[in-house]
Amino acid sequence: VDRPFKEVEANEGYRLSIDLAEQTLTTPGGETFTFDITEHRKHCLLNGLDEIGLTLQHADKIKAFEEKRRQSQPWLFNG
């Protein structure tokens, strides 16, 4: 994948097409390269999530856990 990026640096206006879902990069000449990315990172990028957004997807479970803990260990929450 180094060669296409060298082309980008050397040629103003040079464009690459990146298909994150298929993990491919295509040059203007039609040459295709594959690249690796972790499933976690891919999921976040495809869904526009950062670590906070990813955590907020589980807000209901987090609230349920907190409430259960508040009931089972109320001394932690006094004050």
Swiss-Prot record:
Its EC number is 4.2.1.33. GO terms for molecular function: 3-isopropylmalate dehydratase activity. InterPro entries: Aconitase/3IPM_dehydase_swvl. Keywords: Amino-acid biosynthesis, Branched-chain amino acid biosynthesis, Leucine biosynthesis, Lyase. GO terms for biological process: L-leucine biosynthetic process. It catalyses: (2R,3S)-3-isopropylmalate = (2S)-2-isopropylmalate. It is an enzyme of class 4 (lyase). It comes from the Bacteria. Catalyzes the isomerization between 2-isopropylmalate and 3-isopropylmalate, via the formation of 2-isopropylmaleate. Belongs to the LeuD family. LeuD type 1 subfamily. Heterodimer of LeuC and LeuD. This is 3-isopropylmalate dehydratase small subunit. It comes from Neisseria gonorrhoeae. The gene is leuD.
